[in-house]
Amino acid sequence: MNNNDQIVWCDIPVKDLDRAIKFYGAVLDQPIKKESHEGMSFGLLPHPHDGVGGCLVISKEAQPSANGPLVYLNCINRLDAAIAAVEKNGGKILQPKHQIGPYGSRAVILDSEGNRIALHSK
């Protein structure tokens, strides 16, 4: 992460942490590490040590929602495989894969918890 990054972290709210870890592990084709810190369990999304990251978290303050900010997850070189894993793992395709100008392609999905998420590839 450099000092010019505007987004540095995201928490994706979930209802069932184990179900969400399974869903995101399948869609991203990477292990989601379950951790616990100060009595709070969360699923750590893969990210470089010095890069933008995020986690799956159960929270009283935030509930899964299809309304609100749209988080884009990196599916570079495997967007089609990620999309194919969505419905098999309890999600739903809201917008099929489409071009977003010079910024690549995306599909907008509903994850296993009810969050609207974009899967993105350049």
Describe the role of every protein-language-model region.
Residues 6-15, 61-87, 105-110:
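Vicinal oxygen chelate
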